[in-house]
């Protein structure tokens, strides 16, 4: 992602915010450690990639199975869906917590070296904002079924608190390394705990304290945070003010989200920076260049009032997006970018 983004920036001339993965798979599933033997296998079954991760401990074997669409040309960037979770019950989690290894020096060095490389490659073309280990709720839901998590918070309070604190500590320790890196800011995924999944009271009681624990590490280290929720978020606006984040992306409108840029601008004012809002799923891909240019101009005129806005699409470009539409997007945004 880093090198492709820099090359694209040089070709199309836009302000760059790179969103590369430093560790797409967490360190504890990349390789084996003492009492933690990892086997990672990817195979094609019935037209799908199936990724199976097995972890053998002295007590029992944990297993995670994920699937994604098969494409013989690509492997990176595939969105895998979990079919079997590493931690299926409280017994599994106790094993996970007991034997999950600590980082080694090589893991720390990898993050720090990645920051140096990003700094050198990007230069004055923009800033780097890699994905760290993830938002706490997102990370927990990678290894524990989110349906169980929703219920655990209400019916198994001690168990829920135990695993959320465990994952919060993992993310916080990850953030401590990023604070010492040359990356300009840090990305946190917060799209699982979205406004379509839960209400504001639930979020503030069962999600916010753990996210804030990890966010505070970055705040104390003066490292800006981009918090990602590309879905519904309107009911969570009050909670987002309490998160302590620097930037919230992506302000997605219907049908992907329920946000309206003008309303979000009015609500947040200068409490945080808004990032995104242009529909790349349908409009950028399907509209004419003229329509794209006008929409980009209009969105920029709305977003730039009072500052605290970064114009962008609401997520990555879809396969099949016409290059002429991307160029039209940039023309429209540039035409409205000046303050006069």
Identify what each model region corresponds to.
Residues 71-84:
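Short, surface-exposed linear segments at secondary-structure transitions and domain or protein termini
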């Amino acid at each position: 992602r880093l090198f492709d983004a820099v090359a694209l920036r040089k070709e199309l001339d836009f302000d760059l915010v790179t969103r590369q993965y430093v560790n797409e798979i967490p360190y504890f599933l990349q390789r084996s450690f003492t009492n933690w033997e990892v086997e990672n296998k990817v195979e094609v079954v019935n037209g799908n990639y199936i990724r199976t991760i097995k972890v053998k401990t002295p007590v029992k074997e944990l297993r995670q199975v994920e699937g994604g669409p098969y494409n013989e040309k690509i492997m990176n960037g595939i969105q895998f869906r979990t079919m079997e979770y590493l931690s299926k019950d409280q017994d599994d989690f106790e094993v996970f917590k007991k034997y999950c290894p600590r980082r080694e020096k090589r893991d720390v060095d990898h993050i720090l070296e990645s920051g140096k490389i990003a700094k050198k490659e990007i230069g004055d073309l923009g800033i780097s904002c890699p994905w760290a280990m993830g938002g706490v709720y997102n990370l927990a839901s990678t290894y524990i079924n989110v349906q169980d998590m929703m219920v655990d918070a209400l019916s198994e309070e001690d168990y829920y608190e135990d695993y959320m604190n465990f994952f919060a500590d993992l993310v916080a320790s990850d953030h401590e390394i990023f604070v010492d890196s040359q990356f300009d800011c840090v990305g946190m995924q917060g799209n699982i705990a979205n406004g379509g999944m839960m209400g504001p009271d639930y979020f503030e009681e069962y999600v916010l304290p753990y996210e804030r624990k990890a966010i505070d590490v970055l705040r104390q280290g003066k490292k800006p945070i981009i918090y990602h929720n590309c879905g519904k978020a309107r009911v969570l606006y009050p909670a987002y003010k309490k998160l302590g984040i620097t930037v919230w992306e992506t302000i997605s409108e219907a049908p992907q989200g329920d946000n309206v840029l003008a309303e979000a601008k009015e609500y947040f004012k200068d409490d945080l920076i808004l990032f995104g809002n242009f529909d790349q799923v349908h409009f950028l891909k399907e509209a004419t260049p003229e329509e794209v240019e006008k929409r980009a101009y209009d969105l920029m005129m709305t977003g730039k009032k009072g500052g605290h806005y970064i114009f962008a699409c609401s997520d990555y470009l879809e396969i099949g997006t016409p290059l002429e539409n991307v160029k039209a997007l940039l023309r429209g945004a540039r035409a409205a970018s000046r303050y006069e």
